[in-house]
Amino acid sequence: MRYPASEKLEIIRLVEHSSLPVRRTLTKLGIPRATFYRWYDRYSGGGPEALTDRSPRPDRVWNRIPDEVRQRIIQLAIEQPALSPRELAVRFTDNQSYFVSEASVYRLLKAHDLIASPAFIVIKAADAFKDKTTAPNQLWQTDFTYLKVIGWGWFYLSTVLDDFSRYIVAWKLCTTMKAEDVTATLELALQASGLDQTELANRPRLLSDNGSSYIAGDLANWLGARNIKHLRGAPYHPMTQGKIERWHQTLKNRILLENYFLTGDLETQIAAFVDDYNHRRYHESIDNLTPADVYFGRGPIILAERERIKRETIANRRLQHRLQAA
């Protein structure tokens, strides 16, 4: 069976984000492993465009992006070098009300030496909790990560992340990793979400690892008094909390580019990054929406608007091609 490039890309995305091993995922999809890895090698070396089977027929030039639009895409890429082709395509569509695909952006940037080969990695371990969430505030993930302030030593960032939307509900930079630091962060999360004012029956569940602060009796008592059910991940399997683990890695990749000599400077940078992550960073796993879009329920409206923009853009390109050919 011959698959179009769009379906090959979708299959690769499914395998990347599957909680099952690669072999089992491919078996369920009915895709031979040799075929998948041939696609994946082409994708890793040339991006989405490399998945297209070469045809002797001429390209459909009617869908070519106009030169003026191409220049605007290039300018955005220069101004936002940290954005991937996927993120650039979504941001351009949202901000300019003009649809461009990830493959088109990748091809354009590649032609102008503005991109290297993509660093796509097939995920081999489960990165999602087994009971899927269906709405915000059903399940929160929490964990600590280490950050250093020169001359002051190590500090510990405690974070509460909403499982469904990836939204950072609350965070706190702590000097210890005690149960009281966990409860302080959770108190901030309850206040920020407004759940401190709701019925106890509507409180989220909490997912953590088995660190000493999370198995403490004081935390259990605090959670019990607030009707928050505590779930703990499987020992020696941190990918149960894959979303917050990836958040920590994303944070450190940005934050640790600089040295910090004052805790206030570190907190300022964390606050700025959390704001960017929540409100401006597009996540492929949530339909290229931002965590805030999903958490606050704006997703359906945004996705409907993108689909409208896509239809109008393609219709306009067809019309312009016909006018030029007449």
Which ranges hold each PLM region?
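C-terminal domain-tail junction helix/linker
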Residues: R2, G217, G224-I228, Q249-A326
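Short, amphipathic alpha-helical "recognition" segments used to contact nucleic acids or chromatin
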Residues: Y3-L20, R70-E79
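Short alpha-helical "recognition helix" segments of helix-turn-helix
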Residues: R23-L29, L88
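Short coil turns linking two alpha-helices in DNA-binding domains
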Residues: P32-T35, S101
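Basic, flexible linker segments flanking DNA-binding modules
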Residues: D41, G45-L139, H237-P238, F296-I301
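Mobile-element integrase/transposase regions
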Residues: E68, Y98-F99, R107-L161, Y167, ...
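Acidic/histidine-rich, metal-coordinating catalytic segments
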Residues: L186, T198-A216, Y236, D287-A292
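RNase H-like polynucleotidyl transferase catalytic core
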Residues: R203-N210, G224-K243, L257-T263
